[in-house]
Amino acid sequence: MEEAGCRNIIFSSSATVYGDPKEIPITENCPKGICTNPYGWTKWMQEQMLIYLQKASPEWNVILLRYFNPIGAHHSRKIGEDPKGIPNNLLPYVAKVASGALEKVHVYGNDYDTKDCTGVIDYIHVV
């Protein structure tokens, strides 16, 4: 990136960097780096490397996005997880099976070239 003159990076991190939070809702001010699994630790370490890069070289622009897996619906029931057709996310899929709308949960793919045979994509390449 440096050789190409690209000093902007948006990092796809995770809310797992918060570990098991002591307060809800989680805010930017909550303690971080108290991870409970290796995935969270790797995201936290990558965040730290990018923060140090930006401190050492202020011409770098770093944005950290900490994704959550939101589940649920608004108390009015007017917005929430109720996909049309076959859902793409696990929880609405399980909810449709539990309600009888679908017969069973299907698991697709067991032949990915990873240790646990799941598809893992950590980086987004933009051309």
Q: Residue spans of the language-model regions?
A:
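Conserved NAD(P)H cofactor-binding loop of Rossmann-fold oxidoreductase domains
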Residues: 13-14
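NAD(P)-dependent short-chain dehydrogenase/reductase
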Residues: 51-127
